[in-house]
UniProtKB/Swiss-Prot annotation:
It holds the Pfam family Apo-CII. This is Apolipoprotein C-II. PANTHER family: APOLIPOPROTEIN C-II. Its main location: secreted. It comes from Plecturocebus moloch. It is found in: Secreted. Gene3D superfamilies: Apolipoprotein C-II (1.10.1440.10).
């Protein structure tokens, strides 16, 4: 047997040994990840729901028709401006990606 064969055999056995050691990890660590993610999603969702409820209650308490009209007007103007700027940005990105022809 040559030294290359022994070296290759040693490396294969070393890799297999590490694979066997990795297989003995408890399964709880893998399942802990999704549970943590689920808890974070639930807490963020509850915070978002409470913030929406607080904003809705505040809006209902301070409802004024003139303010509501101004808010709707500002919303429509800002969405029109944002759609225009989004179109410009999209055109710029596409022209950069295409390059000069």
């Amino acid at each position: 047997m040559g030294t290359r064969f022994l070296l290759a055999l040693f490396l294969v056995l070393l890799v297999l040994g590490f694979e066997v050691q990795g297989a003995h990890l408890p399964q709880q660590e893998e399942s802990a990840g999704p549970a943590l993610l689920t808890q974070m999603q639930e807490s963020l969702s509850s915070y978002w729901d409470s913030a929406k409820a607080a904003a809705s209650n505040l809006y209902q308490k301070t409802y004024l028709p003139t303010v509501d009209e101004k808010l709707r007007d500002m919303y429509s103007k800002s969405t029109a401006a944002m759609s225009t700027y989004a179109g410009i940005l999209t055109d710029q990105v596409l022209s950069m990606l295409k390059g000069e022809e």
